[in-house]
């Protein structure tokens, strides 16, 4: 059963300007180590960061809180499954909020779709509760 849906559209140019202005201060506050490593390897790092930023915003909306109530950018990270499919890893307040949404006997699954077409990056998040195995 679907328990949360969120989407976000991010202007890559805005992220590019933020990277130029704040650099590591922005990336270390907003992104996980894994996200920083992956984005810094990309030829268009602003696009990579923008997709991840959109994913965090979309995830916070799917959690039903936005970026408040203990849900912070640093508590959500884009990770890839062994197949390469992207998903979200949650910690702290984001993980606590997710746990509170899931009915007893169910396990959460976070589906993530990312895309970009300059100057925009977009993310969709669907949080599903499936029977625990």
From Swiss-Prot:
One BP annotation, GO: fatty acid biosynthetic process
Swiss-Prot/TrEMBL catalytic activity: apo-[ACP] + CoA = holo-[ACP] + adenosine 3',5'-bisphosphate + H(+)
GO cellular component term, pick one: cytoplasm
Location in the cell: Cytoplasm
Statement: the UniProt record of this protein carries the keyword Lipid metabolism: yes
Superkingdom as given in the UniProt entry: Bacteria
Repeat in keyword set: no
Broad enzyme group: transferase
Record key words, sorted: Cytoplasm, Fatty acid biosynthesis, Fatty acid metabolism, Lipid biosynthesis, Lipid metabolism, Magnesium, Metal-binding, Transferase
GO molecular function: holo-[acyl-carrier-protein] synthase activity; magnesium ion binding
UniProt cross-references to Pfam families, sorted A to Z: ACPS
Enzyme nomenclature, EC number: 2.7.8.7
Cofactor: Mg(2+)
Residues annotated as binding Mg(2+): 8, 57
Stored SUPFAM superfamilies: 4'-phosphopantetheinyl transferase
Function noted in UniProt: Transfers the 4'-phosphopantetheine moiety from coenzyme A to a Ser of acyl-carrier-protein.
Family: Belongs to the P-Pant transferase superfamily. AcpS family.
Protein name: Holo-[acyl-carrier-protein] synthase
Organism per entry: Caulobacter sp. (strain K31)
